């Protein structure tokens, strides 16, 4: 097991870095405003049609543009889901959604969470899937990348107050990054057997003689951006464990690569833009080390079997419950870590069926803020918040004003950093408490006791951190749960983006100080250790009590 697991992780990271490096070069050019070859005419035509003027924006204007796009998309998607029954491309004649489910779904896809309180094949029409959800998969991913573009420029520029043009960035990200790569991935998925059609559901007779319906649909086109944009919402209820979404071991591996591709490339781009590639590599090393340790722990936990079965005298050397045999223990474990380290939430196995410790690692990866590679854009700006916190702590220890990349980190930046870091823990802990204190919240719990608490904690953690995966075991399609999780998803997304943009606006106007003998090096092994320690410290102090009541207590109760 150890050799196979090591080979799988090593080959995954090697291919990831080989693909991410050239993409990082492209992203760096876009951040610096260097036109890509042969695309200037297309860009100018799109901007003329959309009425976009290529003028620089300050942080408030940039933030307002991002918020306007997402709020407008929220209302459009909400209306589309409510009116689904009268819209085209609905061969199964599926009705419109209830108001609370439509609200939850709209917020979910606009916020890049893709939490699903429904089964896609029995709830949504092809029109809703293609024009509603797939479009938001592109726009939410582009929004996250645009925010990190602005923050990266804030570190690279000095004595100005502009961060680029949000509409220009969104257009370029969508046209030259998300669309072309998604097209290539979608064609590969189709070649491997993923569905892509607009046919009505097919009727067939099973071996038992029962007539059933075989779902159809434009799956591959949504599956590609679902992975590349770290969205995660599946066309089918079984998500990427469904053979129509993820038919082979090769598509499974490509899906994992697609999830991490842009987050890793952004680290390379960050180093290029700030003219110090060591900075990008430092962030990548910190993310990779945490990722490797977590992946190894989940593989180890799942390989040692299910204690529930052992107590019943059932031979259970490995825990295959809830896993697809075509993927097995190692690929399922790695997928679980990838999808929760990033804010993706796609699943190829049932996380609720993992062992107590095997399920705790994905839960904890979400709770630390999705900063281990993380979502497209959101992962890097989340990690940079921890970088600012780390240099602040180091500055206190050595008695110097904290600096990062020559920019002094003052009281304003630290207040905003603290606010951004504390938004999601507050949502998780208070949301979990509210769900457990109210009858409406407890009525959705199917599994009472320790594991039921873990399921509630996982659901709220997933929503607040914009992941979207679930432990299941909850009846989440109710007014209480749909509204609670919608609130957590919206505030968890934009409650972090607002202070991040404010930090960018503050930093971009500052002068870049020359490096001196007293400057703390923010690259190399020492700073990697300091950064990882900061992430672990904040995560441990915040969530250890809650984890002790859930997965830890469940693990100890089985020994």
UniProtKB/Swiss-Prot annotation:
- So where does this one cross the membrane? 6-26, 63-83, 131-151, 173-193, 253-273, 283-303, 327-347, 356-376, 379-399, 416-436, 484-504, 524-544
Q: Name one GO molecular function term.
A: potassium ion binding
**What domain of life is recorded for the organism?**
Bacteria
Q: What is its main location?
A: membrane
List cellular component terms (GO).
plasma membrane
Subcellular location(s): the record lists: Cell inner membrane
The family database entries (Pfam families) matched by this protein are listed as:
KdpA
Membrane topology, as annotated: Multi-pass membrane protein
Q: Which InterPro entries match?
A: KdpA
Q: Does the keyword Membrane apply?
A: yes
Q: Which key words tag this protein in UniProt? A: Cell inner membrane, Cell membrane, Ion transport, Membrane, Potassium, Potassium transport, Transmembrane, Transmembrane helix, Transport
Role of this protein:
Part of the high-affinity ATP-driven potassium transport (or Kdp) system, which catalyzes the hydrolysis of ATP coupled with the electrogenic transport of potassium into the cytoplasm. This subunit binds the periplasmic potassium ions and delivers the ions to the membrane domain of KdpB through an intramembrane tunnel.
Which family is this sequence assigned to?
A: Belongs to the KdpA family.
Describe, as the record does, how this protein assembles with itself and its partners.
The system is composed of three essential subunits: KdpA, KdpB and KdpC.
Known PANTHER family for this protein?
Answer: POTASSIUM-TRANSPORTING ATPASE A CHAIN, POTASSIUM-TRANSPORTING ATPASE POTASSIUM-BINDING SUBUNIT
Designated name of the protein: Potassium-transporting ATPase potassium-binding subunit
What is the species of this protein? Enterobacter sp. (strain 638)
Gene (UniProt): kdpA
């Amino acid at each position: 097991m150890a050799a196979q697991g090591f080979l799988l992780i090593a080959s995954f990271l090697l291919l990831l870095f080989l693909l991410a490096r050239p993409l990082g070069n492209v992203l760096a050019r876009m951040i610096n405003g260097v036109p890509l070859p042969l695309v200037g005419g297309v860009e100018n035509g799109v901007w003329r049609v959309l009425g976009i003027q290529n003028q620089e924006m300050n942080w408030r204007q940039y933030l307002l543009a991002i918020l306007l796009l997402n709020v407008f998309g929220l209302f459009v998607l909400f209306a589309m889901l409510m009116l689904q029954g009268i819209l085209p491309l609905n061969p199964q004649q599926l009705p419109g959604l209830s108001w609370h489910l439509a609200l939850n779904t709209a917020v979910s896809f606009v916020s890049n969470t893709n939490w699903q309180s429904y089964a896609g094949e029995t709830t949504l029409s092809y029109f809703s899937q293609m024009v509603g959800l797939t479009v938001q998969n592109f726009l939410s991913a582009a929004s996250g990348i645009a925010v990190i573009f602005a923050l990266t420029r804030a570190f690279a520029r000095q004595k100005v107050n502009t961060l680029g043009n949000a509409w220009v960035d969104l257009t370029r990200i969508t046209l030259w990054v998300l669309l072309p790569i998604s097209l290539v991935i979608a064609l590969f998925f189709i070649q491997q057997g993923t569905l892509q059609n607009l046919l009505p559901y097919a009727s067939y007779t099973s071996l038992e003689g029962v007539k059933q319906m075989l779902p159809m649909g434009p799956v591959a086109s949504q599956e590609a951006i679902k992975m590349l944009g770290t969205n995660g919402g599946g066309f089918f209820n079984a998500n990427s464990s469904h053979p129509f979404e993820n038919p082979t071991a090769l598509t499974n591996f490509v899906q994992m690569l697609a999830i991490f591709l842009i987050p890793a490339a952004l680290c390379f781009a960050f180093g290029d833009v700030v003219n110090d590639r060591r900075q990008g590599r430092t962030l990548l090393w910190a993310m990779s080390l945490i990722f490797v340790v977590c992946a190894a722990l989940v593989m180890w936990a799942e390989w040692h079997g299910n204690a529930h079965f052992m107590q019943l005298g059932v031979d259970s050397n490995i825990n295959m419950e809830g896993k697809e045999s075509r993927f097995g223990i190692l690929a399922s474990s790695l997928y679980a870590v990838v999808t929760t380290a990033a804010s993706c939430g796609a699943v190829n196995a049932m996380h609720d069926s993992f062992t107590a410790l095997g399920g705790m690692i994905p839960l904890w990866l979400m709770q630390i803020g999705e900063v281990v590679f993380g979502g497209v854009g959101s992962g890097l700006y989340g990690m940079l918040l921890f970088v600012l916190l780390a240099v602040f702590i180091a500055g206190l220890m050595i008695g110097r004003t904290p600096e990062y990349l020559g920019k002094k980190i003052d009281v304003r930046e630290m207040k905003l950093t603290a606010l951004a870091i504390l938004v999601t823990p507050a949502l998780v802990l208070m949301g979990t408490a509210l769900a457990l204190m109210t009858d409406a919240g407890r009525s959705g719990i199917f599994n009472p006791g320790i594991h039921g608490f873990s399921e509630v904690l996982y659901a709220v953690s997933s929503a607040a951190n914009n992941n979207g995966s679930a432990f299941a075991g909850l009846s989440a399609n109710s007014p209480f749960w749909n509204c609670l999780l919608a609130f957590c998803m919206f505030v968890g997304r934009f409650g972090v983006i607002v202070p991040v943009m404010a930090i960018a606006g503050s930093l971009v106007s500052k002068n870049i100080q020359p490096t001196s003998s007293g400057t703390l090096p923010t690259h190399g092994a020492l700073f990697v250790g300091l950064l990882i320690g900061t992430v672990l410290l904040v995560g441990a102090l915040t969530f250890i009590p809650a984890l002790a009541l859930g997965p830890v207590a469940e693990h100890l109760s089985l020994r």
